[in-house]
Amino acid sequence: MPRYYPVFIDVTERTCVVIGGGAIGQEKVEKLLESDAEVLVISPVVNQKVRDMADAGQVTWEQREYKPGDLAGAFIAIAATDDNKVNRQIAAEAQERNVLLNVVDVTHLCTFIAPSVARRGEVTIATSTGGASPALARTFREKLTGSRILEYADLAPVLASARAELREASLVVKPDHWQTQITEELLDMVQAGQTDEARKMLMDGLMEGASPVAAS
């Protein structure tokens, strides 16, 4: 089994091809749209939700079977078909064109796999089992989604603001000291709407460990 390199990919305004228009294809399309991709769906038949997205101009739908050449100009491609022959053809073209490819539930044909994702605010936590057990990855996601730990995502705006202020002042704080300031008390204050007080407490704590950026 490959040892996958974990990475987040910016697909904004990039052409992403989804081959297949059933429930799984629909799920892939929706996730790509959430990331502002330009989505092309190729399938002779699509479900109503995909059809509605096409009618609304959210995606481009070509109502036909896949044919070689369909991945020209694609940034990534997703094969959501149950046709092994077609999947192999898509994989061959993707390899030839250096297009990143996910073939749903056919790990050995993939050059990337889609993790199970838990999101809150600006924080995204992706979990993968390398294709060994998607059910286990979903279990991680569900447990994270219902846990206190994911609520720490609510701190992201305050932490980003503090980071920007330190950068503006040409100050640096070591990672270990940063982590000591990310506390339950800080989270409670932010969730109670005491954002200004939380930010002040955070900055006071960070300044205790801040030092000037070394001259280059």
Task: Please give the residue ranges for each predicted region.
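Hydrophobic, well-ordered beta-alpha structural blocks that scaffold small-molecule cofactor pockets
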Residues: M1-V45, V50-M53
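Residue-level detector of alpha-helix initiation sites
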Residues: A23-I24, N84-K85, G131
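Hydrophobic beta-strand scaffold residues
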Residues: V39, W61, L100-L101
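E1/E1-like adenylate-forming module used to activate ubiquitin-like modifiers
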Residues: V103-A153
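An accessory alpha-helical subdomain
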Residues: G131-S216
